[in-house]
């Protein structure tokens, strides 16, 4: 989880204890290139931490694919509508290379937000930064 931890700590100084709790609640998965880890029209309640590889968020409309976001090593990605509103995702997330990804269910991440102030602050600042980039 070296890339993920480095990126987390670039955003906020999360303690070793909190990072250990985060890692204990994650599952390691491997996805081959060209895999849709989130599919439009499907509700997905997972947060994906990219340790190795690259993925893109893509919006499908009228037979056209529009890339809206790239997720690099150390970054997180998720279906926004699914995660925030428990509705089917309007975008898909596709791996552009073979990927090593840690996943965590949003309920577990919310539990960590409630337990560890530094994880909650990291999440808040992360979302502020993403919204600023939009």
Regions found by a protein language model. Name each.
Residues 1-134:
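Cytosolic regulatory regions built on CNB/CRP/Popeye-like sensor folds
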């Amino acid at each position: 989880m070296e890339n993920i931890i480095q990126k987390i700590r670039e955003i906020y100084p999360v303690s070793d204890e909190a990072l250990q709790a985060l890692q204990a609640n994650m599952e390691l998965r491997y996805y081959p290139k060209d895999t849709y880890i989130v599919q439009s029209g499907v509700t997905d309640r997972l947060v994906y931490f990219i340790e190795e590889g690259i993925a893109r968020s893509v919006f499908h409309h009228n037979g056209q694919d529009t890339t809206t976001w790239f997720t690099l090593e150390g970054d997180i990605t998720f279906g926004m509508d699914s995660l925030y509103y428990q509705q089917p995702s309007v975008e898909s997330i596709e791996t552009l290379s073979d990927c090593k990804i840690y996943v965590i269910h949003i309920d577990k991440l919310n539990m960590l937000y409630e337990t560890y102030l530094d994880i909650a602050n990291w999440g808040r600042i992360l979302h502020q930064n993403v919204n600023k980039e939009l």
